[in-house]
């Protein structure tokens, strides 16, 4: 890869205020503030050199009168942790000042040689890009390289919309999916070397069974994150209409054939933009963006409201959760094991049977 560093224009690391407001959430991973940023989608997540790293979209709110030049888009904030519970902010190095374009959604991956990299959509470029970590703290990155697939005749495809890319390796081949607009299907590319990409067509298999899955094939698939879980493939994604959801199925003949579809949102679509990683002991752990909602209508706070004047957060990262499959292939979701260290003053009752239409009072629990 191009070893030119892009981290030399970094701004200082964000920091929590010494005395945060009473309504400021500090239990979840929340961007420091208040009133300084609009944090959003979680993005590249890694376990690397003994630490977990997570990036997320971070758009600093600058009053219009203080803006200098055009708005080139958001940065990616960067945090790391030894346990995915207690986080440290790093300097913000991935953004317009260093990459030449804003950082929209993407994902992290490891090359076949074990080197960490990122693939993402560069705001304003209508293209996806790849960059590689140059140091163990992930504070220095290579100059971004263009991802431009070719058709069967070897001609570059320049008129295709690209956004929200995800990348994985299967049988020694790199595959990358590009999300597209709500009226278009996600498309697949493949490469042997991360430089030369072939366009493969639609990701979803033509045998996609809408009746069985309970969802239309053309339902928006954005923020995809695809990985193997047990002997099945899982596609986490969102619909801008439905919120966070998932498919379970098989990746066969270089297409994805789902067998199950499930929702991760119910009353509201405030659980958004999933991202996951593998832990050091092989667990699949995911995050999502918890968008701000109004209690009355369960809808995101309208952007036209005076967000700059709000003294509350406009989004936090969900608590991390572990994903696994049951023996009969059902997706199981449970809180991250490491969160147990936050528990105090445990009360326990065991071998308890509660019959229907009865009340059992737990002693010492309020």
Residue ranges of model-derived segments:
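Beta-rich carbohydrate-recognition and catalytic domains
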Residues: 4-216, 221-222, 228-268, 281, ...
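Secretory/extracellular carbohydrate-interaction modules
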Residues: 354-366
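Catalytic and ligand-binding motifs that coordinate phosphates/metal ions
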Residues: 268-278
């Amino acid at each position: 890869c191009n070893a030119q560093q892009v981290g030399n224009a970094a701004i200082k690391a964000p920091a929590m205020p010494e005395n945060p407001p009473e309504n400021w959430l500090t239990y979840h991973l929340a961007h420091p503030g208040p009133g300084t940023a609009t944090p959003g989608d979680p993005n590249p997540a890694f376990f690397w050199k003994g630490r977990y790293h997570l990036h997320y979209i971070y758009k600093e709110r600058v009053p219009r009168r203080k803006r200098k030049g055009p708005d080139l888009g958001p940065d990616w904030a960067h945090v790391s942790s030894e346990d995915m519970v207690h986080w440290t902010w790093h300097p913000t190095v991935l953004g317009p000042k260093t990459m030449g374009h804003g950082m929209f959604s993407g994902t992290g991956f490891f090359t076949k040689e074990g080197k960490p990299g990122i693939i993402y959509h560069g705001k304003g470029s209508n293209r996806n890009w790849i960059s590689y970590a140059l140091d163990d703290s992930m504070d220095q990155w290579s100059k971004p390289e263009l991802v431009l697939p070719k058709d069967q005749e070897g001609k570059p495809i320049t008129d295709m919309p690209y956004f929200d890319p995800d990348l994985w390796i299967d049988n020694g081949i790199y595959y990358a999916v590009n999300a597209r607009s709500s009226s278009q299907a996600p498309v697949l590319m493949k490469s042997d070397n991360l430089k030369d990409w072939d366009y493969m067509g639609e990701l979803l298999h033509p045998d996609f069974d809408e009746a069985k899955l309970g969802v239309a094939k053309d339902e928006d698939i954005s923020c995809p994150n695809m990985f193997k879980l047990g002997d099945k493939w899982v596609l986490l994604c969102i619909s801008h209409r439905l919120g966070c959801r998932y498919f379970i199925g098989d990746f066969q003949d270089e297409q994805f054939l789902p067998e199950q579809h499930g929702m991760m949102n119910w009353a509201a679509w405030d659980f958004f933009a999933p991202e996951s990683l593998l832990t050091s002991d092989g667990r699949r752990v995911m995050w999502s963006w918890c968008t701000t909602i109004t209690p009355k209508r369960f809808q995101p706070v309208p952007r036209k409201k005076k967000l700059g004047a709000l003294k509350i957060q406009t989004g936090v990262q969900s608590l991390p959760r572990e994903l696994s499959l049951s023996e009969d292939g059902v997706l199981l979701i449970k809180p991250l094991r490491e969160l147990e260290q936050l528990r105090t003053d445990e009360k326990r009752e065991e071998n308890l049977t509660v019959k229907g239409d009865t009340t059992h009072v737990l002693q010492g629990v309020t």
